[in-house]
């Protein structure tokens, strides 16, 4: 039986594409542009897994489709190659992280090429290449000049095992590090911060301009966390000191019965009484060991210590005890809250635990039993009594401003971006600290500041990076003899990925990030495909940098990525025992269609789960390509289900996709071709062209493949195939199965040209219309027959056809026809007696 020999055909066309630079980015300025971007991978030692090609195949189908439609297509690939894993490996083995990274990139590239993706490799970027990170450093110097990069002594999320601080976004809900799962503690350190908060409002507003999944927009909105309220000043009793509180509910000020400061608040030591000093110091020490997430966990028991001091409530002059508690963060708002326990669950729990006053100021509920958090008219609130929420907020803010003890305020949950890492394998931060106390950026003509090669990349132990150990690199002298030290912190992995999509546009430019005319031509990115896990990290950081570059006049658009699509996760096959515990696949055997634990004999339930080394259910694409071919993997991953759904991997599904490609191969290579069109396949062919075109546009790849299958089934029923329709069909399947597409195009055309730039087929709407219709024939309103007749017959023709039908003649034999009602294209009703 004829079948598709992938082991021969796929390498042949991969060589052809490489030699002929088939996918070189078009530069014809008369053509429209299409920029299709994948989230570039971190080149890990493990190589690609089958989850990577899902998103890559989607952008590849779009890229091939758009080329055929006459677009200039920019479809690049590169490497996000700085980061902790390579450094950790280097520390464990003594090898250079650069060598390890280069080996991993070579392996990734081999795997990617084996899958037939149409990348323009002339535009490859690598974040660890000095010619690339020169511009990462240049962007940093611009941030520094604009006051958007600054140093601060801040409590950081310190991970002892990693020897570095990590960003809030990299701390997991259980208070451990995203990488490695190590304990995270709070520790004050000198750090570089980026002022992303200066762009909070624009980052929020401009989400309206982009075509992104609403779920991702919501995650960014929540992360930015805009809230409108008021700042209120509280004086400390018997003291010159005061502190400010931000609240979204200034109207509940009459119900504020105590205040809470973050343990790190600058005022704590100044107002603490002698009697409370020891307890306060111990509490501060314990709080410093916890991450922000652990401190704000709603389920944890409320803890706190009274400072011994009181604040004066400005609206009624009442004394409010001032406490410290770790659920208040110094980094959020002002680091101080006014507690209204009657109407806030956390404040209520705290008040109950420490026997503090609870005064209701809104109607409804029993505040001795639980906090009342619904809205209601105001009570116990003097000039606010009887007002609703909106009226009371407006009146309170006016009162605060009149008395000069507060003002309306917009606050954001978003914090500035902790940008420094105490590691070796990252971009050096181009700053020099001079002994006269000043700091300067490395001048542009001295960039890139090269990361020095060293064998000793262990953390310095002082909290500085290993670069602090390399004195000949570290120490510099100015022309006037003033000595200085280079910045020893390096940038986080997020730095290089915050602007890489710009470098693809002009990757060899040594005078600028990219030529301004080329940036104008290619931006914004038309489609960006990647995982939803990057919603508030990479995607927010890239938008921030893009807006800074927009303000500098470097880029012409406000937003980098016009359309974002998150592919789903490909789950592995896994097995659960009666307790719900997962069992590794090498401990499972299949008997008579059921699955059993090899060691215990227990019958197991098959269940999809995330692929992981521990479950031994990771599928390596190399194995799939070897056994089934790259085109099979591509078609299978697109046919599994909707692109954004999470779906379990299935060998049976893979085999089904392979069989389909074999049927396609047989159809084109063995069916007799003809130059005469019988018209038999016109309708299904034009339906297929239309459906596949529209479904690729809308990224419904699974339904596009289903339509291709419908055409193959119909074509197999015919003795001959109209050659032009066969060619059109091969063009339709080529973006999904490009090696097969090229091979069959060659079979049909005897051409040695690639199918890649052949114009996309078009459909004829007239051919989609049915020429025949089904006519229902009724006698006295009851259906007696259904006739297939030519469309648009006259009433007389319909009547004649109905009355001459043998079944109808038998029904009306011996009866008198009273009248015949004919409705064109629908029915004939015969009335008899």
UniProtKB/Swiss-Prot annotation:
It catalyses: tRNA(Leu) + L-leucine + ATP = L-leucyl-tRNA(Leu) + AMP + diphosphate. Keywords: Aminoacyl-tRNA synthetase, ATP-binding, Cytoplasm, Ligase, Nucleotide-binding, Protein biosynthesis. This is Leucine--tRNA ligase. Its main location: cytoplasm. GO terms for molecular function: aminoacyl-tRNA deacylase activity; ATP binding; leucine-tRNA ligase activity. A motif ('HIGH' region) lies at residues 41-52. It is found in: Cytoplasm. One of its GO terms (biological process) is leucyl-tRNA aminoacylation. Coiled coil: none annotated. Pfam families: Anticodon_1, tRNA-synt_1, tRNA-synt_1_2, tRNA-synt_1g. Its EC number is 6.1.1.4. It comes from Streptococcus uberis (strain ATCC BAA-854 / 0140J). A motif ('KMSKS' region) lies at residues 610-614. It is an enzyme of class 6 (ligase).
């Amino acid at each position: 039986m004829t079948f598709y020999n992938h082991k021969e055909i796929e390498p042949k066309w991969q060589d052809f594409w490489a030699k002929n630079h088939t996918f070189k980015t078009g530069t014809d300025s008369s053509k429209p542009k299409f920029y299709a971007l994948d989230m570039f991978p971190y080149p890990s030692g493990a190589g690609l897994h089958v989850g990577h090609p899902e998103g890559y195949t989607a952008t590849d189908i779009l890229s091939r489709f758009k080329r055929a439609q006459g677009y200039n297509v920019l479809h690049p690939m590169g490497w996000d190659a700085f980061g902790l894993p390579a450094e950790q490996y280097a520390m464990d083995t003594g090898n250079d992280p650069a060598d390890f990274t280069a080996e991993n990139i070579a392996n990734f590239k081999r795997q990617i090429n084996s899958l037939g993706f149409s990348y323009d490799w002339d535009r490859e970027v690598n974040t660890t290449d000095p010619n690339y990170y020169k511009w990462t450093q240049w962007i940093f110097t611009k941030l520094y000049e604009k006051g958007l990069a600054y140093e601060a002594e801040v409590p950081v999320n310190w991970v002892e095992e990693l020897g570095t601080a990590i960003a809030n976004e990299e701390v997991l809900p259980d208070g451990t590090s995203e990488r490695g799962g190590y304990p995270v503690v709070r520790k004050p350190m000198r750090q570089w911060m980026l002022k992303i908060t200066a762009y909070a409002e624009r980052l929020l507003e401009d989400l309206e301009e982009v075509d992104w999944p609403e779920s991702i927009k919501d995650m960014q909105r929540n992360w930015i966390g805009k809230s409108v309220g008021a700042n209120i000043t509280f004086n400390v009793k018997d003291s010159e000191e005061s502190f400010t509180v931000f609240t979204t509910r200034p109207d509940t000020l009459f119900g504020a019965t105590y205040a809470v400061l973050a343990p790190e608040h600058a005022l704590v030591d100044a107002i603490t009484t002698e009697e409370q000093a020891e307890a306060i110091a111990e509490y501060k020490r314990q709080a410093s060991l916890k991450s922000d997430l652990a401190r704000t966990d709603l389920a944890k028991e409320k803890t706190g210590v009274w400072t011994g001091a009181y604040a004066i409530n400005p609206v009624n002059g009442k004394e409010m005890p001032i406490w410290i508690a770790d659920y208040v963060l110094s980094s959020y708002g002002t680091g101080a809250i006014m507690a209204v326990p009657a109407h806030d669950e956390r404040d209520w729990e705290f008040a109950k635990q420490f026997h503090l006053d609870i005064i209701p100021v809104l109607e409804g509920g029993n505040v001795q039993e639980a906090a009342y958090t619904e809205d209601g008219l105001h009570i116990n609130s003097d000039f606010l009594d009887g007002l609703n929420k909106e009226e009371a907020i407006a009146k309170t803010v006016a009162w605060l401003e009149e008395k000069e003890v507060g003002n309306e305020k917009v606050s954001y949950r978003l914090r500035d971006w902790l940008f420094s890492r105490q590691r070796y394998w990252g971009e050096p931060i181009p700053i020099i600290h001079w002994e006269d106390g000043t700091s300067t950026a490395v001048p542009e003509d001295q960039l890139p500041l090269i990361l020095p090669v060293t064998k000793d990349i262990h953390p310095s132990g002082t909290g500085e990076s290993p670069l602090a150990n390399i004195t000949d690199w570290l120490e510099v002298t100015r022309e006037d003899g003033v000595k200085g030290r280079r910045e020893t912190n390096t940038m986080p992995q997020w730095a290089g990925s915050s602007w890489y999509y710009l470098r693809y546009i002009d990757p060899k430019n040594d005078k600028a990030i990219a030529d301004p005319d080329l940036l104008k031509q290619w931006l914004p990115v038309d489609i960006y495909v990647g995982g939803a896990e990057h919603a508030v990290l990479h995607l927010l950081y890239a938008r921030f940098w893009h807006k800074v570059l927009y303000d500098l006049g470097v880029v012409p658009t406000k937003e980098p990525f016009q359309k974002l699509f998150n592919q789903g996760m490909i789950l592995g096959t896994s097995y659960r025992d009666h307790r719900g515990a997962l069992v590794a696949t090498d401990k499972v055997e299949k008997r008579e269609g059921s699955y059993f634990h090899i060691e215990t004999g227990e019958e197991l339930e098959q269940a999809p789960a995330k692929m992981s080394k521990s479950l031994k259910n990771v599928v390596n694409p190399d194995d799939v390509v070897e056994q089934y071919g790259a085109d099979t993997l591509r078609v299978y991953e697109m046919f599994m289900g909707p692109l954004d759904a999470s779906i379990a991997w299935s060998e049976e599904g893979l085999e089904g996709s392979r069989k389909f490609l074999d049927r396609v191969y047989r159809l084109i290579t063995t069916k007799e071709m003809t130059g005469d069109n019988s018209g038999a396949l016109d309708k299904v062919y034009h339906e297929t062209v239309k459906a596949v075109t529209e479904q690729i546009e809308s990224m419904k790849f699974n339904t596009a493949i289903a339509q291709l299958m419908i055409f193959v089934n119909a074509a197999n029923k015919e003795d001959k195939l109209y050659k032009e329709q066969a060619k059109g069909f091969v063009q339709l399947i080529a973006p999904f199965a490009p090696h097969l597409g090229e091979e069959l195009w060659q079979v049909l055309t005897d051409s040695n040209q690639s199918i890649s730039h052949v114009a996309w087929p078009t459909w004829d709407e007239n051919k989609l219309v049915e020429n025949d219709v089904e006519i229902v024939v009724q006698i006295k309103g009851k259906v007696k027959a259904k006739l297939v007749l030519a469309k648009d017959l006259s009433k007389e023709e319909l009547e004649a056809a109905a009355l001459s039908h043998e079944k109808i003649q038998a029904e009306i034999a011996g009866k008198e026809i009273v009248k015949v009602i004919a409705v064109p294209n629908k029915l004939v009703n015969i009335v008899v007696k």
